[in-house]
């Protein structure tokens, strides 16, 4: 295998194969679950809206891939600062059967100078998730924060409040994952000494095997080779899968999403 193919194989097993579109249907989610069982191996997870969790669970079980995890989103995509609503949505996602919850950090509140509400919101959602053995990823929306100091601060607050992962983006704003924001966020994980318990997820804009290889190389450099396993690293993507399969010599269609 070439270096790119090795990276593509790694990346495929780290994918949160995603559809978060307003026109999602049961049929589209079923098709996504079928794609998660790829000829080159299973993706780590599918990421879908909460109402589709039951049909995804049924599909994954019936196709013999019960270990593919189901991630969903809460406080999404706007990252409002109403803790109670974020908590109610997170509890509902858990009740639907989510294995993982990706909650949006109240990033606009942080930009306005309020650090406390972000901590309190993540902490409340973490307590709900921990009680159900559900993984919590916190989306800090780096493309809106823009400023390196704010990206670092949002990462630090999320980690201190209990995040299991910090994630770049919703995929719903003009600027999503970038290597620059990834380096900032993984550097925080390294500098806080939490690499054993906290992972990183770039999302939105990671579309090719070459893109994925760059993120994995960055993770290897900052946090050590072997750190970026499925407990510590995910790609939030949809169209990436087709590129990975093509790189690995398989013919496959993408999901057609821009995520």
From Swiss-Prot:
First-listed, main subcellular location of the protein, grouped into a coarse class: cytoplasm
UniProt cross-references to SUPFAM superfamilies, sorted A to Z: Aldolase
Pfam families associated with the record: DeoC
Gene Ontology terms: biological process: 2-deoxyribose 1-phosphate catabolic process; carbohydrate catabolic process; deoxyribonucleotide catabolic process
Molecular function GO labels: deoxyribose-phosphate aldolase activity
EC number in record: 4.1.2.4
Catalytic activity from the UniProt record: 2-deoxy-D-ribose 5-phosphate = D-glyceraldehyde 3-phosphate + acetaldehyde
Catalytic residues (positions): 102 (proton donor/acceptor), 167 (schiff-base intermediate with acetaldehyde), 201 (proton donor/acceptor)
Keywords for the protein's UniProt record, in alphabetical order: Cytoplasm, Lyase, Schiff base
InterPro entries for this protein: Aldolase_TIM, DeoC, DeoC/FbaB/LacD_aldolase, DeoC_typeII
Domain of life: Bacteria
Keyword Cytoplasm (UniProt): yes
A GO-annotated cellular component: cytoplasm
Localization, UniProt: Cytoplasm
The protein's annotated pathway: Carbohydrate degradation; 2-deoxy-D-ribose 1-phosphate degradation; D-glyceraldehyde 3-phosphate and acetaldehyde from 2-deoxy-alpha-D-ribose 1-phosphate: step 2/2
PANTHER family xrefs: DEOXYRIBOSE-PHOSPHATE ALDOLASE (PTHR10889:SF3)
Family membership: Belongs to the DeoC/FbaB aldolase family. DeoC type 2 subfamily.
Task of the protein: Catalyzes a reversible aldol reaction between acetaldehyde and D-glyceraldehyde 3-phosphate to generate 2-deoxy-D-ribose 5-phosphate.
Name by which UniProt lists this protein: Deoxyribose-phosphate aldolase
Gene name of this polypeptide: deoC
């Amino acid at each position: 295998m070439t270096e790119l193919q090795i990276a593509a194989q790694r990346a495929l097993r780290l994918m949160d194969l995603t559809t978060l579109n307003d026109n999602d249907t049961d049929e589209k989610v079923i098709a996504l679950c079928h794609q998660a069982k790829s000829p080159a191996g299973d993706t780590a997870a599918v990421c879908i809206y909460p109402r589709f969790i039951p049909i995804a669970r049924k599909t994954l079980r019936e196709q013999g891939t019960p270990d593919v995890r189901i991630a969903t989103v809460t406080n999404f995509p706007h990252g409002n600062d109403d803790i109670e609503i974020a908590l109610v949505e997170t509890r509902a996602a858990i009740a639907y059967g989510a294995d993982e919850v990706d909650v949006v950090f109240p990033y606009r509140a942080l930009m306005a100078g309020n650090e406390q509400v972000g901590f309190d919101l993540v902490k409340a959602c973490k307590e709900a998730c921990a009680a159900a053995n559900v993984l919590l990823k916190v989306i800090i929306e780096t493309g809106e924060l823009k400023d390196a100091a704010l990206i670092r601060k949002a990462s630090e607050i999320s980690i201190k409040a209990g995040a299991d992962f910090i994630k770049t983006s919703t995929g719903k704003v003009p600027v999503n994952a970038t290597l620059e924001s990834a380096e900032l966020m993984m550097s925080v994980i390294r500098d806080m000494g939490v690499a054993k318990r906290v992972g990183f997820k770039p999302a939105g804009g990671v579309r090719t095997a070459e893109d994925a290889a760059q993120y994995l190389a960055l993770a290897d450099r900052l946090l050590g080779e072997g750190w970026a396993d499925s407990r510590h690293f995910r790609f939030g993507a949809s169209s990436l899968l087709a590129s990975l399969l093509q790189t690995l010599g398989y013919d496959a269609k993408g999901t057609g999403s821009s995520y």
